[in-house]
UniProtKB/Swiss-Prot annotation:
Residues 53-76 bind DNA. One of its GO terms (biological process) is regulation of DNA-templated transcription. SUPFAM superfamilies: Winged helix' DNA-binding domain. PANTHER family: MARR-FAMILY TRANSCRIPTIONAL REGULATOR, TRANSCRIPTIONAL REGULATOR, MARR FAMILY. GO terms for molecular function: DNA binding; DNA-binding transcription factor activity. This is Uncharacterized HTH-type transcriptional regulator YxaD. It comes from the Bacteria. Coiled coil: none annotated. The lineage of its organism: Bacteria, Bacillati, Bacillota, Bacilli, Bacillales. Residues 11-139 form the HTH marR-type domain. The gene is yxaD. Keywords: DNA-binding, Transcription, Transcription regulation.
């Protein structure tokens, strides 16, 4: 792939990266006990606090019905808690529970260890640059 258009290179590498990440997430080599969707939902609630289903669905670019199913599964496992919005009792908010925080923290630690291992040959500057570029790419997907 020498002398390749940079955008072609990015497209190919991103496609390959996503395929490998999904494989690892679904294989016996999976990092942690939480499924990717559960991990992301718990992480969102932990980082940004209570949220409505609609807000969460918009954040992840999912149908409300899909997000509702994911939330219901986490609620059944007591990893998140539903309560009435104090400003509008007709609306429910979700928040992460203590158990949810514990499982999230354990999974996050395993994920960080895996990434530390994968990036062990990278300099701090390379990791920072890659993180910044990934943030920009993620933002470009939703803009």
């Amino acid at each position: 792939m020498q002398n390749q258009n940079p955008v072609e290179l990015i497209e190919y590498e991103l496609t390959t990266f996503i395929r490998r990440a999904v494989y690892l997430d679904q294989s016996e080599k999976r990092t942690g006990n939480l499924e990717r969707s559960s991990y992301l939902l718990l992480r969102q609630l932990d980082e940004f606090g209570p949220a409505r289903v609609k807000e969460l669905a918009e954040s992840f670019k999912l149908d409300i019905s899909t997000l509702s199913r994911q939330a219901a599964a986490l609620e059944a496992k007591e990893l998140i808690y539903r309560f009435s919005d104090p400003s509008d009792g007709r609306v429910s908010l979700f928040t992460i529970t203590k158990l949810g925080k514990q499982l999230l923290k354990a999974d996050q630690q395993k994920r960080l260890e895996r990434y530390e291992q994968m990036l062990k040959e990278w300099s701090t500057q390379e990791k920072e640059m890659f993180g910044e570029l990934l943030q920009r790419m993620n933002k470009a997907f939703i803009d």
